[in-house]
Amino acid sequence: MRTFLLAVFTLLNVVAIQAQSLNLETDNGVKYNDPQVPASIGIVLYSNDVETVFNALRFANYSQEWDNQVQIFLLGKGVELEGLVKTNEDIKKQVDTFVGQGGVIMGCQTCFQSRKKDGSQICKVACIQDLYDLVKKNQIVLTF
């Protein structure tokens, strides 16, 4: 009986801890998971697949509509975005909307160099430190 009560007590403590973790608050009392509070979102885009790129940009634009700050870092094949913009009108519209709303797009300098390119018209050439900063400073980081 004593073991059973100890197990129940332990389980109740675990449930209480998990319930508290769902309502974590910052120092100023704002809940982390509060959908009414804007977040900072970093997106690492490392694909040149049209559907994946389109959905990443669509998500970025949707997030901006909810007053979230969004940054995109192009990595690997992601730096080929400019070519997709030239050949796909839907992606061009998404990029234009994102940049027009103040969104920031950065592209990996090394990835451009490996493709014998100096950079892109649609993004700032960036380095590994910029990618590190994006991951470190944003509350949410997604990869596509």
Identify the residue ranges that each predicted region occupies.
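Bacterial Sec-dependent N-terminal signal peptides
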Residues: 1-25
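Short N-terminal segments immediately surrounding and downstream of signal-peptide cleavage
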Residues: 21-45
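Short, glycine-rich nucleotide/cofactor-binding loops
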Residues: 36-54, 79-86
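Histidine-anchored nucleotide/phosphate-binding helix
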Residues: 53-68
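Short internal beta-strands
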Residues: 60, 70-76, 106-109
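Mature extracytoplasmic domains of secretory-pathway proteins
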Residues: 66-91
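A glycine-rich helix N-cap at a beta->alpha junction
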Residues: 88-117
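A short aromatic-anchored loop/beta-hairpin motif
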Residues: 101, 106, 120-142
